[in-house]
Amino acid sequence: MELNELPQMDPRALKATSVKAEDEHANSAEPQALKITAASSNPKMFTLPWHKPLATWPKDLLANLPRGISRHVVRFVHVGDEVYAMKEITRQVAEREYEILRRLQKLELPTVTPIAVVIGRHTREGEPLEAILVTRHLKFSLPYRALFARNLRPDTAERLIDALAVLLVRLHLAGFYWGDVSLSNVLFLRDADAFSAFLVDAETGDLQAQLTDGQREYDIDLARTNIIGELMDLASGKLLPGDVDEIEVGNRLVDRYHSLWSTLTDTDKFNPDEMWKIEQRVNKLNELGFDVDELEMKTAEDGKRVLVRPR
């Protein structure tokens, strides 16, 4: 079937393109025709009602999945056999977040998968609409509020914090400055008796070669403040067990982060007859989800000890 014969096609999609992400120096003028920037094409994307504000999309397109709190309009949309999360934001923010998520994915970090950025959206009357960032829905994941709405174990808050600490350390090791760490910007997956955390919002993030201690500490302090506020909000809604101390849980993130960061980056000193401790440390890191590909080992100046640090 020819493109111009497709039923239910947004007229502006007739001039649409599906391409690789453009260079950052490309023309920043708002396109007059719909433009879908994506790493791979999905023909079903062109049949969606891009001419409508996301909040007004037909219910038959939407997937009834729990959504977290967001500053923007967010909807889960059926696109063929896939379910995509769509967020309506400004073009500049959408394109930047898309690129950051792509880079984080290439580093094999736990984030949602970016699918596309849609710009050049207009109503039938020609009024401009905000861009839409499209990511793949993470199957079986839940936002933190949906987890607390269920009858879970009393230590759920602590387990979520532990998962967030692991995520934050992994991102920081890769040089990612988050800038807005919170439970709201994370999705959680059940992993046996624990949880795994995935980054879903990278609007304020920045990927650098290496973070300074000040950048890391800012992220940690902001995370603590946001988490305490989010848990207090849960408590006011009777969703948090009465014996949970919100401030104590917030402090737990700080403690867990520093403990994990130290385990990953500090140099241990062993006597030559204590080499079994190296395996013990590697096993501990593997249990936390960190693959230790290499160990840097050298003899101390006194010649009696071995210095070991993961690489």
Predicted regions and their residues:
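Catalytic activation segment of kinase domains across protein kinase-like and atypical kinase folds
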Residues: 177, 183-233
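Hydrophobic transmembrane alpha-helix bundles
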Residues: 150-162, 214-227, 270-289
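Alpha-helical structural motif
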Residues: 140, 216-219, 223, 246-249, ...
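Proline- and acidic/polar-enriched loop/turn elements at helix boundaries
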Residues: 116-117, 183, 297
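Conserved ATP-binding subdomain of kinase catalytic cores across diverse folds
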Residues: 43-158, 162-179, 226-234
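Regulatory N- and C-terminal appendages and interdomain linkers associated
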Residues: 1-66, 79-81, 91-97, 107, ...
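A broadly tuned "polar low-complexity/structure-edge" signature
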Residues: 1-21, 111-117, 157, 212, ...
